[in-house]
Design a protein with these regions (language model features):
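Conserved catalytic cores of very large enzyme subunits
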Residues: 1-213
């Protein structure tokens, strides 16, 4: 049994290496970008889950071919008291390992499940109620229509739009080639309101198209 576990552990590490390498070399998105991917982990206390998390962290720590830091997948370690936060917790060793890896590679990021805005959704024994994030920004959890569906799986961004606020600031501000003698705050907010309405209409139109797919 010990020999089998050791062999499985080695194979798992190689699988994690391949997983990370693939997600940093598959230029399959628009513009030949690699997939924007995220992995949330840290609360699985099963032997299999612990083995995967340990080897994933070790693979991140080792880096890519020339020891470069792998950017993808974005790694998020979920911290939970009673699971991995305290020395007596079953996954505390993985929490310590994640801190060591983060000190070197800047990943993983950390998601604190005991934070009040996350803990309100947490139900012991239901992993789907553990808040998960997409990369370093998107957190979709609450459901005002059906609180029973306030879960992580199947959630995310349908679409997104960016507003260039610095450009608006320069356009209506007192710096740059088109500098004004005085900041035009009314003009800034008027154009911002117009852009917000445009983004709203654009997102609703995309939503209607996506609903028909």
């Amino acid at each position: 049994v010990e020999k089998a576990v050791k062999k499985t552990d080695k194979i798992t590490y190689q699988a994690m290496e391949a997983f990370i390498h693939n997600l940093n070399t598959m230029h399959s998105r628009a513009g030949a970008q690699v997939p924007f991917s995220s992995v949330n982990f840290g609360t699985d206390t099963s032997p299999e889950g612990r083995m995967i998390v340990k080897n994933y962290l070790l693979a991140v720590d080792a880096g890519l071919g020339h020891s470069e830091t792998p950017i993808f997948p974005i790694s998020i370690f979920k911290v939970k008291e009673g699971v991995n936060y305290n020395p007596e917790d079953p996954n505390y060793d993985l929490f310590k390992l994640s801190c060591q890896v983060s000190a070197k590679r800047l990943f993983p990021n950390f998601e604190f499940l005991d934070a009040p805005y996350n803990l309100q959704y947490y139900v012991p024994g239901r992993p789907e109620t553990e808040v998960a994030t997409m990369g370093c920004r998107t957190r979709v959890m609450g459901n005002v229509v059906d609180p029973e569906k306030a879960v992580s799986p199947g959630r995310g961004n349908l679409s997104f739009t960016t507003i260039n606020l610095p450009r608006l600031g320069i356009k209506h501000g007192i710096v740059g080639a088109r500098a004004n003698k005085k900041a035009d705050m009314e003009g800034f907010y008027a154009e911002l309101d117009s852009l917000l309405e445009l983004c709203r209409d654009q997102l609703l139109e995309r939503f209607e198209i996506q609903c028909k797919k």
